[in-house]
C-alpha cells in the first residue's frame, strides 16, 4: 500500500539559556530543543526523513529502505516513523548479525533487517549497489545512509524557518 503522507508537523521550543557570564557579556543565547520533537523521531532525524517520506509518497512507494549500523539512530527513527505512519521499512545493516537495543527496537517497529557483513556494506558507494535491492523490493524507495543527500540538505531550510518562528516568539527576530 502506498505511503500516505503524514499530517504531522512537530515544533521544537527555543529555550533561552541564562548564564551569569553570558549576561555580563550582554549575550543572549537560546537552544533549539530538537530533542523534544518526538521521543523516537527527534533531533535532526525528522528533518532528514521528512523529504524522503514525501518523495516516496509522491512516487507511490510503499515504504523506504536504508542503511546503517547496529546502533543507527537513523534506522531507529526510520523504523519508528514507519510504524507510526504505517509504511514498510527495510534496513541494510553493517556487519554481522547482532542483537543490540537498537536492533531489537528496529524489529519491534516492524523493520525487516538484512545484514550485509563489512565487505558488503563497503559496497554501498558503488553505482550499482541499489540494483539488487530495487529488484527485491521494487515497492520501496531507497534512502542514503543516515538519510543524507540533496533531499535532506534541502530539509535544513525547514530548521532555519523553525528557528525564525521561535526567535520571533522570544522577541528577538532576525
What are these regions (language model features)?
Residues 1-174:
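PLP-dependent amino-acid enzyme catalytic core
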